[in-house]
Amino acid sequence: MSESYDVVVVGGGLLGCLTAWMAARDGARVLLVDKDQVNQHASGQNAGSLHFQLEYRMVEAGEEAARVAAEAMPLHLDAAAMWARLEDEIGESLGVRQTGGLMVAENADQVGMLEFKAELERSWGLDVRTLDRSELDTVAPYLSRDIVAANLSALEGKADARIAAPAVARAAVAAGAAVCARTRLTGASHTPTGWDVTLRETDRTGEVRTRTVRTAAVVIAAGVWTTELGQVFGAGLPTVPLALTMTVTSKVPAFIPHLVQHAGARLSLKQSLDKTVLIGGGWPARLMRDADGAPEFDRKHQLIPRSIAGNARAAVNAVPSLERVPAVRSWVGTTTVAPDQLPLVGAVKGAPGVFVATGGSAFTLGPSFARVLTGLLAGRSPDIDLAPYDPARFTEGSTP
């Protein structure tokens, strides 16, 4: 067997590219594979939010659910610090701007939720303060007069999802990693020194070549394909795939410096460096499924007109001047969450040398996920308690 590596990273999104880059910097022999192209799927389709406050999906189910979701806050804080220096370390622009993020409220119930959320986040070390209407007049005059308060985190912001992962992939190659696109991992067998993995590569002419690669370790950084890849290694990695709606407007003079989210609605919006406004926040799209109801991730998922309209209404309600800005395009992005909304990060039970990271905010938390995984690959003890994110926590007999 001619090909051998210290680690094979599966998934060419931001997380996979970061892991390949960091591991290669550590001196590991790294192969990064993606069944399609680098940045083709979730990392390149998302809206590029860097949201370190708890999102609406994490608090809409109530205070207890929010407390559980807040257990990921050490990863949020770590990622916020890493994003602040990532462009300098990579040596390229990733479109990062951490100019602050607002979660806005329109009524007393939502303000009460903001106060609870801010207290919870501060207990974990995230600096969040609540702004009243008069303060918002100065900080965010573009907001609707219906907005009566907001939580502000100075760490939040945005990155450019179109360029971030490709830039990191180039840095990984410069550090010595090999990158193979159009290459699907289809099988694995355990060996005394790690794994022999079967790779199926399709070249640009459609010709298929299958080869086996020996590796000491495998990292699953494959988003919605996590559960499928776990099965290749005989492991149960339960995830819930989601198809979500995004919309981009035409260019408009810069007027929104913040990431904006809502305490009572599915909304995130921010103005990109090219002056378009990106609108998202969790409005569903139609995830394509087969006749048995199983998701088919290789098919093109479908937009739902009422989601596009609902998302646009939420955006205009928060920022009224957007009503005069034409929408240019809407598209579907995918993500995956765990049943308890916390990420899966760490070693895969029953599959020695296999590691995984995934869960809801993998773009935002990608730098932290990758740093943790790279440390585990190198045998370093993690400086973040990974117990709440244990991939085995849903396995029968495991203690959450």
Q: Where are the regions a protein language model picked out?
A:
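Dinucleotide-binding Rossmann-like beta1-alpha1 core, especially the glycine-rich loop
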Residues: 49-135, 266, 306
